Amino acid sequence: MYLELVKKNSVILDKDGNKVKEVELPFIFSFPVRKDIIRRVFLAEFTHSLQPKGRDPMAGKRTSAESFGINLGMARVPRVKNSGEAALAPNTVGGRLTFPPSVDKKLVEEVNDKEKQLAVISALSATADKVFVKARGHVFKDSVSFPIVVTDDIVSLKTASEVEEFLEKIGVYDDVKRVKERIRIRAGKGKMRGRKYKESIGPLIIVHDSNSPIVKAARNIAGVDVVNAKDVSVIHLAPGAHSGRLTIYTETSIKILDERLSKRLVS
């Protein structure tokens, strides 16, 4: 089965939101959106962030308790000598767990390399479709065209206020406002464990240089993430396995993504 893909065109904007030129996009932005593959790969990659946990094999067993035996008119649970206090058994205070978690459990789910690359291509394609971006809940001006491609000089932005001003000029700052308004206190014990607030997902900026000033400038803006094109994955493009994240690309990052992923469309 062969797919006939048609290349899309995109407008390139400068820091002030003005149209600079129009370019032809690579085929990776024309691929059909496969939600099933995106979800499968997202869940597999998410397992890499899980921390193995287990219990001390001797937990609850550090006692000399033994059962007193039968025909005494009492339960046959192990009991501490000279006190008769039940111990060791799973149904006793301070006893062992019945089936404790084991560090040997395999937490990381593996996925085929081809499938992983296909998921990234599919997620990239969703970011180029206004319908998918809108359906995900992002807010932006009607004049915004997708995908959003900007000139490389935006990576030189040094302060958060400059980045916010840039987002306002290209018409996506309303999405940052949406995230700020929806920051809320988490339910449950996570509040005690350094996760007091829950924050929604906002715009993603894909750059070509991890050491550029914009990486630090944007990290304190609510919901905004900055990622190198070499490292971008389904985790960034489709958080929660929901495709269509509002994404901003630099001109060079498009070329890096094309070099990295176009071979998969040919093979």
From Swiss-Prot:
Gene Ontology BP terms: translation
Signal sequence segment: none
Superkingdom: Archaea
Keyword hit for Ribonucleoprotein: yes
GO CC annotation: ribonucleoprotein complex; ribosome
GO molecular function: rRNA binding; structural constituent of ribosome
Keywords from the named record: Ribonucleoprotein, Ribosomal protein, RNA-binding, rRNA-binding
PROSITE patterns with a match to the protein in the record: RIBOSOMAL_L1E (PS00939)
Listed InterPro entries: Ribosomal_uL4 (IPR002136), Ribosomal_uL4_dom_sf (IPR023574), Ribosomal_uL4_euk/arc_CS (IPR013000), Ribosomal_uL4_euk/arch (IPR045240), Ribosomall_uL4-arc (IPR019970)
Record bears the keyword Nucleotidyltransferase: no
Oligomeric form and interacting partners: Part of the 50S ribosomal subunit.
Cited function: One of the primary rRNA binding proteins, this protein initially binds near the 5'-end of the 23S rRNA. It is important during the early stages of 50S assembly. It makes multiple contacts with different domains of the 23S rRNA in the assembled 50S subunit and ribosome. Forms part of the polypeptide exit tunnel.
Family membership: Belongs to the universal ribosomal protein uL4 family.
The protein's name in its UniProt record: Large ribosomal subunit protein uL4
Organism: Saccharolobus islandicus (strain Y.G.57.14 / Yellowstone #1) (Sulfolobus islandicus)
